[in-house]
Design a protein with these regions (language model features):
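Adenine nucleotide phosphate-binding catalytic loops in nucleotide-utilizing enzymes
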Residues: 82-85, 92, 117, 121-191
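Phosphate-binding loop of NTP-binding sites
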Residues: 1-107, 111-122, 176-182
Length: 191
């Protein structure tokens, strides 16, 4: 999971959800535990939910996730990169080696939307709180699913006050998509 903002919240949401589904998961990366802890752990994990910063993506040469997520891109860390284009190129690396998995991309961000349109990315799934044409769309406490089930609506009755706001609705959409890919029940997703 990468993006300028929202990585930690999305990583935690997905990590909590898949653990409730009794999936053995390492949750960390830029958030909490370093990824190296997963490799050194006595317990072997079947899944990894990893928050990746642009700094970590710089070092990736072979990385083939089952699910890649790009939340948003805005001007940040420009002191580290040659220019903004270089920063964007680092963020795009989350998809570079994903040849068989799913690639989740927000349409609410101009840079991500352009990337979604221009790049030939396999198995891409768009999500949005603003664009009704996205594969997965959120509006007025409903998720509209046009990817897994055409015109399917899921009503969300309660959302924690901590998760209000468009950016958090995006995080919820990503968790929903992951729940569908991993065949996690609607009940666990809603909880």
């Amino acid at each position: 999971i990468t993006g300028t903002n929202g990585k930690s919240t999305t990583t935690k949401l997905i990590g909590d959800m898949i653990k409730k589904h009794n999936i053995s998961a390492f949750v960390g990366g830029n958030l909490g535990k370093p990824l190296l802890d997963s490799l050194l752990a006595k317990k072997k994990f079947t899944h990894h939910v990893i928050e990746l910063s642009s700094f970590q993506l710089e070092l990736i040469s072979s990385f083939n996730p089952k699910i890649s997520v790009l939340l948003n891109i805005s001007q940040d860390h420009l002191d580290r990169y040659i220019d903004f284009k270089d920063y964007i190129n680092q963020k795009k690396k989350v998809f570079t080696n994903n040849k068989t998995g799913y690639n989740l991309i927000s349409l609410d961000d101009t840079y991500c939307k352009n990337f979604y349109k221009k790049r030939k990315i396999i198995n891409k799934i768009s999500f949005s709180t603003k664009n009704k044409n996205a594969d997965i769309y959120y509006n007025n406490f409903k998720i509209y699913n046009n990817f897994f089930n055409l015109n399917k609506k899921i009503k969300i009755n309660k959302i924690s006050r901590d998760l209000n706001g468009d950016f958090n609705y995006q995080n919820i959409l990503v968790a929903y998509i992951v729940s569908k890919i991993l065949k996690i029940s609607k009940k666990i997703f809603l909880n």
